[in-house]
Amino acid sequence: MRTAFLALGLVLALASPAVAEPLERSAGQTVYVPVYSHIWHGNLDAEQKPRQLLLSSMLSIRNTDPKASMTVSSVRYYDTNGRLLRDFLQKPMELGPMASTDMFVEHKDDAGGTGANFLVEWKAAGPISEPIVETVNAYFFGPQSLAFTSQGRALPAGTK
């Protein structure tokens, strides 16, 4: 009987809809976002190295506020060693209410490595709901495919 209740509890927990966490409000942040320009997989070869799978990555920045605009002031792409590879913005970009933008790292671009990242800086005139900042890392060739997201994380105030 106890097993039946545990099983029922597990089914109910898995079947119930997930509750979204409320978004915080902020007037600006620096957001760290992981990027995977490649991942290691498979078995080690004769040189004790795994195989490398190249991925493309799309950075998505989404203004979640239905009433206020935000300004994306900087989108910088760094490699595994923390070296700046590319500054994606030449000038600040305004995102209106509920608007989105994206940046793309090509499949053939493996310069970032397994520890690549974006630093995204944004600001608003006053506190707005925090944007969603994430990457979609993907590999789609023939019958094989792989895709996963990496969530951005706001850094402590004053971090750049």
Mark where each language-model region is:
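Positively charged n-region of N-terminal signal peptides that target proteins for export
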Residues: 1-4
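Short, hydrophobic/aromatic beta-strand segments
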Residues: 68-75, 87-88, 130-134
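Sec/Tat signal peptide C-region and signal peptidase I cleavage site
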Residues: 16-21
